[in-house]
Amino acid sequence: MTQEVLILPGDGIGPEITAEAVKVLEALQQKDNLDISMTHDLVGGAAYDQHGVPLAEETLEKAKQSDAILLGAVGGYQWESLDISVRPEKGLLALRSNLELFANLRPAYLFPQLADASTLKPEVVAGLDILIVRELTGGIYFGQPRGIRTLDNGERQGYNTYVYSESEIKRIAHVAFDAAMKRNKKLCSVDKANVLEVTEMWREIVDEVAKEYPEVEVQHMYVDNAAMQLVLNPKQFDVMVTGNMFGDILSDEASMLTGSIGMLASASLDANNKGMYEPSHGSAPDIAGQNIANPLATILSAAMMLRYSLNREDLALKIETAVSKVLDQGLRTGDIWSEGLTKVSTSEMGDAVVAAL
C-alpha cells in the first residue's frame, strides 16, 4: 500500500536540504521498492508570504491525511517583526499540537569520523549515543493563562503557566521506557523536583510507570545537574526523558557535543507513531541559497521517518550506512570540514549519499 509523505521545505536553507533528502527517498523508490507518494506544500514564513498565515488550513488537512511529514526548517529575519501569532514558528507549533505529536525524539550520536569536530576532548565524547525524549505539547510553552498585562501601578508583568496532567506525563514516560528497552535499558528522568511542584509530580509518575519496566535502570536528575553532567561526562547517559522546556534546552546542548548540529535528526511522534521529521538545526537564513548547508541531518531525519512511521527499518539502516560511507570517503560540508578533507556543496553531499546507497 502506498504511504503518503508530506514534504514541507519551509524557510531559509529548508528547501535546499529537503531537496537532498527527497533525492535519497526517490533513489530508494527506484532501487528498493519504497512505496511512497510525496506531496510538497508550504509552512512557516513561506506560507505566511503566500497565505497570510504560517500554516494554511488545507496544509494542515494534508498533514492529517499523511502517514509522515518531512520538514526542513522555519523562520528568518524578515518575519521577526510580525505579530507573534503569525510568526513562522507558530506554523510548527500548530502542526505539533493539531497532530498531537507529543513525543520528540532527538538522538545525539557522534559519528566516529567526526570525533575531532566536537569541542570536547575525543576521549570524553567517543562512542557518544544519547536519545533525548522530550514532551512536546504540554508544559510552560502551552499552559494557560499566559500573556503580558499592565498592573494598576502602570508596571508591565509577563506571566506563563507551567502545567502537566498525569496522563501527559504517563504517555511520554512510556515512550521513553519503550525506547530504553530497545537500547541499553537505562533511563534518566530530568526534572526540578526540589523547586517545582509540577516536576515533583513528574518524578512520582515516572517511578510509577517504571514498575512496568523492571529491566530498565532508572535515575532521576535535577535539570541544572543534568546540563552540567552532559558536558562533564556525557557517556553516562543513554535515554533521557524530560518536559518541554527542559528538553528544548538539553537537546540543543547534547547536539553540540557531537560537533555539528548539521548532523542531527529529530522525530516528533503521536500515539500511533505517525510523525513529523526534521533536522535539529534552524533555518540558517545567513547561508540560505548558497548551496553550502549540511543536508545530512535532514537525510538522517528521512531515515528516522522510514524507521518509526513507515516501518522500513531496512531502508533506515541503508541510509545511515550510506551517510557513514560518505564520511569515510572524506567528504564534508563546510560546517564539519577540516584540513585534508574534501569540501562539498549541499547538492554534492546529497549526490554522494545517493551513490553510496
UniProtKB/Swiss-Prot annotation:
Signal peptide: none annotated. Substrate binds at residues 96, 106, 134, 224. Its EC number is 1.1.1.85. Binds 1 Mg(2+) or Mn(2+) ion per subunit. Mg(2+) binds at residues 224, 248, 252. The record marks 141, 192 as: Important for catalysis. It is found in: Cytoplasm. Its cofactor is Mg(2+); Mn(2+). Keywords: Amino-acid biosynthesis, Branched-chain amino acid biosynthesis, Cytoplasm, Leucine biosynthesis, Magnesium, Manganese, Metal-binding, NAD, Oxidoreductase. Pfam families: Iso_dh. Pathway: Amino-acid biosynthesis; L-leucine biosynthesis; L-leucine from 3-methyl-2-oxobutanoate: step 3/4. It is an enzyme of class 1 (oxidoreductase). It catalyses: (2R,3S)-3-isopropylmalate + NAD(+) = 4-methyl-2-oxopentanoate + CO2 + NADH. One of its GO terms (molecular function) is 3-isopropylmalate dehydrogenase activity. Its main location: cytoplasm. InterPro entries: IsoCit/isopropylmalate_DH_CS, IsoPropMal-DH-like_dom, Isopropylmalate_DH. Homodimer. PANTHER family: 3-ISOPROPYLMALATE DEHYDROGENASE. Belongs to the isocitrate and isopropylmalate dehydrogenases family. LeuB type 1 subfamily. Catalyzes the oxidation of 3-carboxy-2-hydroxy-4-methylpentanoate (3-isopropylmalate) to 3-carboxy-4-methyl-2-oxopentanoate. The product decarboxylates to 4-methyl-2 oxopentanoate. This is 3-isopropylmalate dehydrogenase.
